[in-house]
Amino acid sequence: MAFDYKEKFSVAGKKCIVTGAAQGLSRGMAEGLLENGAEVVLMDLQAEKLQAVADEYCKMGYKAHAVAGDLSKKPEIDRMFAEAMEILGNKLDVMIPAAGIQRRYEPWEFPEDA
């Protein structure tokens, strides 16, 4: 009997968040989830670009939502995730934290909250 990976790893109906989703690999991962039946909250710093991406996916019939903000700032993280969880009905099945955030510190100087 062959292993049915499509059923075992299905994301149909799953609630997902993908950060950095306005472009690049993150956008590709979000698109893969959407194409396979997931509802996805797209997050990125680039608000206009992110909204255009979400609108494009919605026109294709996918359940895509844009939540823009700066994931390098704790208050913004809290706001963004509260908004995302409200959109997703307080359910989260898949989280892809793929936003590229660069901070330059020596390893011994890196703040605990960064």
Language-model segments: residues:
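Conserved residues in the N-terminal Rossmann fold of short-chain dehydrogenase/reductase
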Residues: 42, 67-68
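Glycine-rich phosphate-binding loop signature in dinucleotide/nucleotide-binding domains
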Residues: 84-91
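Structural signature of beta-strand start/N-cap positions in the alpha/beta core
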Residues: 15, 39, 63-65, 91-93
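The beta1-alpha1 cofactor-binding region of Rossmann-like NAD(H)/NADP(H)-dependent oxidoreductases
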Residues: 47-48, 68-80, 112
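Conserved glycine-rich Rossmann-like NAD(P)H-binding loop of the short-chain dehydrogenase/reductase
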Residues: 36-53
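Rossmann-fold scaffold of SDR-type NAD(P)-dependent oxidoreductases
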Residues: 19, 92-100
